[in-house]
């Protein structure tokens, strides 16, 4: 697909004279364009749901969720991956973000990195990609060689693959088994796909990882019951989670958390089923860590 024919490279009539307007009007133009992004994502919700189900199936079987991107797309994948361990208590290697150019590229532009097909393949080889893993290629343009080659390699291994782009019929979309293509239109600043396209990608990634965690029993109601308390704010959040899930008071919640080494799931089952920490943990283990199953089946 030629660059000049891509929707993400088109000219936006709404911002044609944005350099001549007041600061407030400039903000309004950008905000009006941003409002269209959730609607674009809404139109591809069935595709997102299908991807979540596949990701969950693979991860449940011992696989990983691998994000692969360059520039903004790569950084968004790393951002999403890095938030999963503290939020949901998963091991750091379960959700992995790879960016063209490596760690240096997180904060700096690396010349030619996104054009390296070898880079995409080698980065996946370096994490010992297996057929159990799911590779999600992220590229606003849908034409990034680093991402396309990575998806091709992943499919050769037998991996399930997802392609996220903002141009219909792109190489990323056609290479991946599952395509998620929110069409956000031309950017306010022509070609600056870190804006609307980047926002759309972030919304999609939020759904992929959050959907995976919900289906994996990491959420009870709407509470992040596997949160790891790495700071004072999260210690307080743990107490509030146990309170909200059980109806107990703060003192009871804290006592239960202390008794089970600050595991929210165990504390919740302890309070709701009137169990000690060991028995609560045992029952959770018997039901794969799903609080709902412990409560519904016992």
Swiss-Prot record:
Stated induction or repression of this protein's expression: Induced by MurNAc 6-phosphate that releases the repressor MurR from the DNA. Repressed by MurR in the absence of MurNAc 6-phosphate.
Keyword Hydrolase: no
Disulfide bridges in this chain: none
Molecular function GO terms recorded: carbohydrate derivative binding; carbon-oxygen lyase activity; ether hydrolase activity
Domain SIS: 55-218
Coiled coil: none
GO BP, sorted A to Z: 1,6-anhydro-N-acetyl-beta-muramic acid catabolic process; amino sugar catabolic process; N-acetylmuramic acid catabolic process; peptidoglycan turnover
Keyword list, A-Z: Carbohydrate metabolism, Lyase
CDD domains: SIS_Etherase (cd05007)
Active-site positions on this chain: 83 (proton donor), 114
EC nos: 4.2.1.126
Note from the entry: A lyase-type mechanism (elimination/hydration) is suggested for the cleavage of the lactyl ether bond of MurNAc 6-phosphate, with the formation of an alpha,beta-unsaturated aldehyde intermediate with (E)-stereochemistry, followed by the syn addition of water to give product.
Name of the featured protein: N-acetylmuramic acid 6-phosphate etherase
Organism: Shigella boydii serotype 18 (strain CDC 3083-94 / BS512)
Lineage, uppermost ranks: Bacteria, Pseudomonadati, Pseudomonadota, Gammaproteobacteria, Enterobacterales
Gene: murQ
């Amino acid at each position: 697909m030629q660059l000049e024919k891509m929707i993400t490279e088109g000219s936006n009539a709404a911002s044609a004279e944005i350099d001549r307007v007041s600061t407030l009007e400039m903000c309004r133009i950008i905000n009006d364009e941003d409002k269209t992004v959730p609607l674009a994502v809404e139109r591809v919700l069935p595709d997102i749901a299908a991807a979540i189900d596949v990701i969950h199936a693979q991860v449940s079987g011992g696989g990983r969720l691998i994000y692969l991107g360059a520039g903004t797309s790569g950084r968004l994948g790393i951002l999403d991956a890095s938030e999963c361990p503290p939020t949901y208590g998963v091991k750091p290697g379960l959700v992995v973000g790879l960016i063209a150019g490596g760690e240096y590229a997180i904060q700096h532009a690396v010349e030619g990195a996104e054009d390296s097909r070898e880079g995409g393949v080698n980065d996946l080889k370096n994490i010992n990609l297996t057929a159990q893993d799911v590779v999600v290629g992220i590229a606003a343009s849908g034409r990034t060689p680093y991402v396309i080659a990575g998806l091709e390699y992943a499919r050769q291994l037998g991996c399930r693959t997802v392609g996220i782009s903002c141009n219909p019929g792109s190489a990323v979309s056609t290479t991946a088994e599952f395509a998620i293509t929110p069409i956000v239109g031309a950017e306010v600043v022509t070609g600056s796909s870190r804006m609307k396209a980047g926002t759309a990608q972030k919304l999609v990634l939020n759904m992929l990882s959050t959907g995976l965690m919900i289906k994996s029993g990491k959420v009870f109601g709407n509470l992040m019951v596997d949160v790891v308390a790495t700071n004072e704010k999260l210690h307080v959040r743990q107490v509030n989670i146990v309170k909200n899930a059980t109806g107990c008071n703060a003192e009871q919640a804290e006592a239960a958390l202390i008794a089970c080494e600050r595991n929210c799931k165990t504390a919740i089952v302890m309070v709701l089923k009137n169990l000690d920490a060991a028995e609560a943990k045992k029952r959770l283990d018997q039901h794969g860590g799903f609080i709902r199953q412990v409560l519904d089946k016992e």
